[in-house]
Regions:
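Short hydrophobic beta-strand element within catalytic cores of glycosyltransferases
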Residues: 300-303
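Conserved donor-binding/catalytic core segment of Leloir-type glycosyltransferases
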Residues: 4-6, 190-217
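A short, active-site helix/loop in glycosyltransferases that binds the activated sugar's phosphate group
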Residues: 140-167, 174-176
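Short His-centered aromatic/hydrophobic patch
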Residues: 91-96
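Aromatic "clamp/platform" in nucleotide-sugar-dependent glycosyltransferases that forms part
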Residues: 283
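Nucleotide-activated donor-binding/catalytic signature segment of Leloir-type glycosyltransferases, i.e.
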Residues: 245-263
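Conserved acidic donor-binding segment of nucleotide-sugar-dependent glycosyltransferases
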Residues: 317-325, 333-337
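Membrane-proximal helix-turn-helix segments that form the acceptor-binding/catalytic region
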Residues: 79-82, 105, 129-146
């Protein structure tokens, strides 16, 4: 089956939850014998690749503008998919889903994966939020098959659009952990094993990393808590440097926070292997891949109590009220004060091999 994928910036090694999802999923789909082409945004990749792990890669130039790059790229990608003879177009995220009806008019069968209500993100203005909501509507009403990554999203589209048929709950996955040390990298960062809190995500407002920095700062300033030897490491960056990301970085540097930039591979694996705990204080998520990845390393986690995080099913003591910096600080202090022990989380729903088979079954249903 000829499958063309759009709605992602690209793979491999491109920052973002949808990008991580596609990087894990589509090589597995290709290994089943499917003919998979993924269309990338040229401004995010410079590796010259035309194929990666069995997935064909096509780069299309798109203006790198936050407000309209996704829709321009999707329009061009749909036209390219038609010229490639795509039997199935797989569209990721609600912004690109705005053009699902166009793809249907061109005769393609469409699978739409809803990764979360992006219009809830703080970074979007009113006009962008309206377009994203329209994209969600178009995807849910006109796609042949809809994949949702959480029960929260499944219930949302049933309530808003009455879409209950041809809807498939298929979770995000997490790869097997790569346990490793990287002494030279730790020396470069000025950190020690087991003596740092890790925040790992994009530097955008809804991730609430400023709350994490505020909570950490309040702890290290209180000498009675004995937190001065514990560092805070923020691994990540932003696609579009803006007032928020610049302010966050400046705030972090002033308070001794370690900034790694966007990292993958051994550097990231070593940070996950050796952190004291992982923290995700966000106000918006679909199903957080970064949290699942931290859980796979059996490290303690502290996360906000938003619906997407609650759906992961962590113990009650791992959650704090979203936006409550004092409660976050108390949770971090409590975790750091306890002896470090590996935590066995239930990860059965999040195996990528299982997830890939579920997605391929959706494709096969379109043969009929």
């Amino acid at each position: 089956m000829k499958i063309v994928v759009t709605g992602t910036r690209g793979i491999p090694n491109v920052m973002g939850g949808v990008e991580t999802h596609c990087e894990e999923l589509f090589p597995r789909i290709a290994s089943f014998g499917e003919d998979v082409t993924l269309i990338r945004r040229a401004s995010y990749v410079n590796d010259g690749l035309t194929e990666w792990k069995g997935v064909k890669l096509v780069d299309i130039a798109t203006p790198k503008k936050k407000s309209f790059e996704a829709i321009v790229h999707t329009f061009r990608a749909i036209n390219k998919a038609k010229s490639l003879g795509a039997e199935v177009l797989h569209v990721h995220a609600i912004g690109p889903a705005l053009l699902v009806p166009y793809a249907r008019l061109l005769g393609m069968k469409v699978v739409f994966t809803h990764h979360g209500p992006d219009y809830d993100r703080d970074k979007w203005g009113m006009a962008a939020k309206m377009i994203l909501k329209l994209g969600e509507r178009m995807g849910c009403m006109f796609a042949n098959e809809v994949i949702v990554i959480s029960d929260v999203i499944k219930n949302l589209i049933a309530r808003k659009y009455g879409r209950t048929e041809h809807v498939h709950l298929i979770y995000n996955g997490v790869p097997s952990p790569e346990i490793c040390d990287y002494p030279e990298y730790f020396e470069e960062l000025g950190i020690e094993k087991g003596k740092y809190i890790l925040g790992m995500c994009r530097f955008v407002p809804e991730k609430n990393l400023h709350h994490l920095v505020e909570a950490y700062t309040s702890l290290i300033r209180n000498e009675e808590l004995g937190m001065r030897n514990c560092k805070l490491v923020l691994a990540g960056d932003t696609d579009f440097e803006d007032e928020y990301s610049r302010g966050l970085k400046e705030m972090a540097r002033k308070n001794g926070v370690v900034l790694t930039g966007f990292i993958k591979g051994r550097k990231l694996h070593s940070l996950l292997t050796n952190c004291r705990c992982y923290c995700l204080p966000s106000s918006h998520e679909g199903l957080p891949i970064a949290l699942l990845e931290a859980m796979s390393y059996k490290v303690p986690v502290v996360v906000s109590d938003i619906p997407a995080n609650l759906e992961v099913g962590l113990p009650k003591e791992d959650y704090f009220p979203c936006g409550d910096v004092k409660a976050l600080a108390e949770k971090l202090q409590d975790v750091v004060s306890k002896p470090l022990q590996p935590v066995d989380y239930y990860m059965g729903k999040y195996y990528w091999d299982k997830i890939a088979k579920q997605v391929d079954e959706v494709y096969q249903s379109l043969r009929h």
